[in-house]
């Protein structure tokens, strides 16, 4: 799992960092819950489960996100892997974020995906994944009907 946030302005990089931290905490939490369901959470304790890249027009920060899992509590952290400037050293690091991200997808992601698949395959069959119905309609279908989009979609499908 990976996210990237790009911002501009005086505190842009910090805002991008916070948004990435939020997104990756949700993703890491989902992985932790999956591994808890199959009683294998020790496999991912303190392991990087997600990456994020935050940048503005000048600087880049690359983080790894992980969880410290105790019996009663899980705490989420991020680890700064690399921080650099695009323009420093005559642009020497201008491809660093790209190379890092490509390596994540080429090397790490396949192993991580296999680990997730094994956990999904080990889910107990008696788990109930049903979602309770919404108390109120979302308003999406009503909004589409009122704008005649449903009819347009139906016509384009035929």
Feature map (PLM): residue ranges:
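Extended catalytic cores and adjacent scaffolds of nucleotide/polyanion-binding enzymes
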Residues: 1, 10-158
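Anionic group-transfer/hydrolysis microenvironments
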Residues: 7
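Conserved beta3 VAIK motif of the Hanks protein kinase fold
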Residues: 4
């Amino acid at each position: 799992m990976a996210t990237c946030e790009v911002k501009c302005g005086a505190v842009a990089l910090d805002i991008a960092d916070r948004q990435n931290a939020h997104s990756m905490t949700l993703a890491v939490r989902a992985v932790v819950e999956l591994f808890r369901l199959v009683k294998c959470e020790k496999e991912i304790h303190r392991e990087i489960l997600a990456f994020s890249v935050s940048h503005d027009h000048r600087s880049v920060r690359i983080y790894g996100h992980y969880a410290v899992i105790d019996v009663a509590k899980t705490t989420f952290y991020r680890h700064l892997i690399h921080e650099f400037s695009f323009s420093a050293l005559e642009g020497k690091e201008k491809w660093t974020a790209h190379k890092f991200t490509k390596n994540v997808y080429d090397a790490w992601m396949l192993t991580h995906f296999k680990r997730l698949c094994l956990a999904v395959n080990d889910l107990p069959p008696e788990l109930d994944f049903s979602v309770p119905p919404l108390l109120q309609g979302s308003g999406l279908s009503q909004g589409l009907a009122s704008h005649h989009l449903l009819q347009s979609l139906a016509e384009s499908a035929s």
